[in-house]
């Protein structure tokens, strides 16, 4: 079923070759377009841009505080939105990467304490959702703290 305004109907009535290309998975499918519009409305309603900036600052500052606490943290990267990475090293001066077993310990203990984090080589990657709350960030930072404390 399709609903069209009078002006659109006239185009089709006056031109037998007129058509609306839709139904493709990659271009202008009405259902996909409706979903995209609904997402934009929710993005504005939930203030995700402002939230991501505030929570990103919170995570970055929290990870920098952890770096002061643990020598195993060689660097904290991010500070521009929510994505943050923690470089794990066995020697800060040489930046020698941490061994895989220690990285796994940090990840597993963080998980046991309520945070699912990703390890990629010697890096702990944080990429929480845009709707993450201040309390969620506190839990995440506490769980990561526990992970580093276990090493």
Language-model features, listed with the residues they occupy:
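Conserved N-terminal phosphate-binding loop of PLP-dependent enzymes in the Aspartate aminotransferase
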Residues: 1-151
